[in-house]
Every structure is written in C-alpha cells, then in structure tokens.
Amino acid sequence: MGVKGLNQLIKEHSPSAYKEFQLKNLFGRKVAIDASMCLYQFLIAVRQSDGQQLTNEDGETTSHLSGMFYRTIKMVENNIKPVYVFDGKPPVLKGGELEKRLLRREEAQKQKTALGDEGTVEEVLKFEKRLVRVTREQNEEAKKLLELMGIPCVDAPCEAEAQCAELARGGKVYAAASEDMDTLCYEPPFLLRHLTFSEARKMPIDQIEYKDAIAGLDMTKEQFIDLCILLGCDYCESIKGIGQATAFKLIKEHGSLDNIVEWIKNNKTKYTLPENWPYDEARQLFMNPEVTNANEISLKWKEPDVDGLIEFMVRQKGFSEDRIRSGAEKLKKGLKGGVQGRLDGFFKVVKNDDKKRKADPKETKSSKKKRR
C-alpha cells in the first residue's frame, strides 16, 4: 500500500530531494530492487494484444518471467547491476493489511462474475488486474530465472524494502528501488521509483534523496516515521479525517505521535483513534526492522547459464529460443565488462564562489607574468 500522500508532501516541502532521469543515467550503479513489487507490476502490465496475461501452451502464466527477463537485460545493457530482494515472512502486524487485500480481491471476483458476458473488454480487464497476486510458485520461478541469468538474489528475513534499504545504507548498492514510499522509513540514501516500468509507459525514473527529504520537511527520523504512520501504512490504519496536510500540521504542532494521541484523548476533537491502535508497534518495525546485516551479504554477478536458460525458458516455459539466446548474449556482453566507474566516483565536487576570486595582494607583477 505504501504511505498515502507522502509523495506529494515531499514534493511540496522538499523539491530538491527529487530528481527525474532516464534509465541510462544510472550507468555504473548497483541497485537493490524489491522483487515482489516488480513481479506484481509485470503480472499487471505484461499482456498480450487482447489484454490477457502471457501464457504458454499449457496455460501457465509467463508474464512475470517475460518482464523479469527483458527488463533486467535492459538494465544490464545500460551498465546497471541489479540485485533482487524477495520478501520473507510478513510481520504479524501486517496481517490486517493482507486481509484487506484478500477481501478486495474477493470483491473484485464477485464484480467480474456479475458482469457475465455483458461486460466490455475494458471492464473485465479492470477486475482481472485487481485479482492479480504473486504466488509462491511465481516467486520461485523468478528466482530460478535470475540465477540462470547470473543476477544475485537476496531472501529477506522479513520485508524486502527494508532489506533493500539496508544494502544501500551498508554501501553494497547505490539505492533501493521500490514503488512503496514507506521504503524511506528505513533510511535508504536514495529511493528509486519506476525503475522496472516498461519504456512504453514513458515514465521517467524518480529518485528521492532521504537526507534532503527530511531536511526539507524539517523533521527528525522519528518524526518522519510518525508522519508516515499518521498518513497510513501497511502496519496500521490511519485516523479518519486526517489527510496529508493535517498530518503534517499535527506533527509540527505536537512533535510526536505520542503527543498527538494524548491530545486527541484529552481534548474534544473531531478525530477518533482506531480501537487498540498499534502505532507504537508500527513505529518499532520501522525503527528496528528485521534485516540481514549488509556486511553479511556477498553480491556476485556471474556469466549467464545459456543452456540452463534454454531448458527453462524455451523447453519448459515456451519462449522463443532465438529471443532467449539473443537476450543471453546481451547479458554476457553487459556483465563481462563489470560496472564502469562513474566520473562522480573519481572527482570531488567543489562549489565555485559566487564572486570572482580576487588576486592575492601579495602577488607580484613578475609572478603574474611568469604564469602567463
């Protein structure tokens, strides 16, 4: 679900934290990607001309494999080294959000069934996309594909976006990539959004710098997390009637979520706290996420296993052999050279003074002549 309204708040108060650029501008970077999120995107976006998901002759869905294969190759061609991080066991506190998602899918199924044969193609597709979920089998297939491609995978003990942020904080990668804005609660130096979107969507990649974001909001790490909880996150519901502007204002006025809760309890306000609201437990999940220390993780990009790719993608999943071989060659070429260094990795940027540097009063005319 992410954090409702956080994107707009950062854009309003911390515009310098945002940058937009194309995939090629990430050349020379290593990036940790929330795998579950991008698999979900591929299942929704990678479709046939009639809007149906890609399937093989046996009727098995292959949209997730197609999206993962070709988008990863595109990154490697641009001299980017991706590492995919998969979700582990969800926190107990997330159970409520997962139950809501299940109920939404059940409702979408009912609405789709009610359409019968009278629904338009667009109406049917709308409900089909709401029914999409990433299965355990699809996760395992994606891991197998990435292993054959020579791309490293990491199994997070809990939330994938928290592990992505840990890899970025630990210097293993440049940034965490996810569509979930709550990734910022785990303090990655940079958050990348839209990284795995299809080029056909023509959406630039958004980069949000964490340090600039909270500086512009003029908040501490703890206040930023409280703001995200107040806006509504995966771990607990929001307070009815409190939108992004009000949430920001309340954090500024009261300083913390604890003080806001006390203020609501002790004053006649129009706000009602949810029953047994676990905001402090949610805060602890953001403050102390269950992750594997970055120093304990070794990331290695290897040459693709072409024979293995042909066996899995062509013989088992029904993809074109020519296309898989062509993709494997692109991977070989991209991974063989390693990540080229970026210029900003060799030079320190020094700001120029606004005024022209005045000549040293001790400097003699003769010394000026010698320099000419």
Swiss-Prot record:
Give the matching SUPFAM superfamilies: 5' to 3' exonuclease, C-terminal subdomain, PIN domain-like
Q: Which domain of life is it from?
A: Eukaryota
Positions binding Mg(2+) 1 in this chain are 34, 87, 159, 161
Q: Which keywords does UniProt give here?
A: DNA damage, DNA repair, DNA replication, Endonuclease, Exonuclease, Hydrolase, Magnesium, Metal-binding, Mitochondrion, Nuclease, Nucleus, Phosphoprotein
For the ligand (DNA), the binding residues are 47, 71, 159, 232, 234
- What HAMAP family is this protein classified in? Fen
The entry's localization annotation reads: Nucleus, Nucleolus; Nucleus, Nucleoplasm; Mitochondrion
- Annotated residues that bind Mg(2+) 2 are located at 180, 182, 234
Main location (coarse class): nucleus
InterPro entries in the record: 5-3_exonuclease_C_sf, Flap_endonuc, HhH2, PIN-like_dom_sf, XPG-I_dom, XPG/Rad2, XPG_CS, XPG_DNA_repair_N
Q: What does this protein do?
A: Structure-specific nuclease with 5'-flap endonuclease and 5'-3' exonuclease activities involved in DNA replication and repair. During DNA replication, cleaves the 5'-overhanging flap structure that is generated by displacement synthesis when DNA polymerase encounters the 5'-end of a downstream Okazaki fragment. It enters the flap from the 5'-end and then tracks to cleave the flap base, leaving a nick for ligation. Also involved in the long patch base excision repair (LP-BER) pathway, by cleaving within the apurinic/apyrimidinic (AP) site-terminated flap.
Q: What class of enzyme is it?
A: hydrolase
This chain's protein is named: Flap endonuclease 1
